[in-house]
Amino acid sequence: MGYRKLGRTSDQRKAMLRDLATSLIVSERIETTEARAKEVRSVVEKLITLGKKGDLASRRNAAKTLRNVEILNEDDSTQTALQKLFGEIAERYSERQGGYTRILKVGPRRGDGAESVIIELV
């Protein structure tokens, strides 16, 4: 299966996709370019599938990709992006077989005219 190079070396591309995937798990909605959104969609779909499995091996595989970001909840407790993935998000999509993300076109970006989109969890 092919992939987009996104004008970066493989290390830079991997780091960017990790950052975007973590941001999408934490915020559940991000704005980025269309090419980046299509690439990060693949990463996030696989992460959510791992979250639904819920076993130790899946947790370790997801931890390889997600950044160790702390999230402050409404009740002043904190959780990591990994905990949110395996708790809240895995529960929400337990009955859904794929298709966890949605891409909405926003229009061209002001600075360079790149096609902007919003990618969000369904």
UniProtKB/Swiss-Prot annotation:
It holds the Pfam family Ribosomal_L17. One of its GO terms (molecular function) is structural constituent of ribosome. Keywords: Ribonucleoprotein, Ribosomal protein. The keyword Protein transport does not apply. GO terms for biological process: translation. SUPFAM superfamilies: Prokaryotic ribosomal protein L17. One of its GO terms (cellular component) is cytosolic large ribosomal subunit. Part of the 50S ribosomal subunit. Contacts protein L32. Belongs to the bacterial ribosomal protein bL17 family. This is Large ribosomal subunit protein bL17. It comes from Staphylococcus epidermidis (strain ATCC 35984 / DSM 28319 / BCRC 17069 / CCUG 31568 / BM 3577 / RP62A). The lineage of its organism: Bacteria, Bacillati, Bacillota, Bacilli, Bacillales.
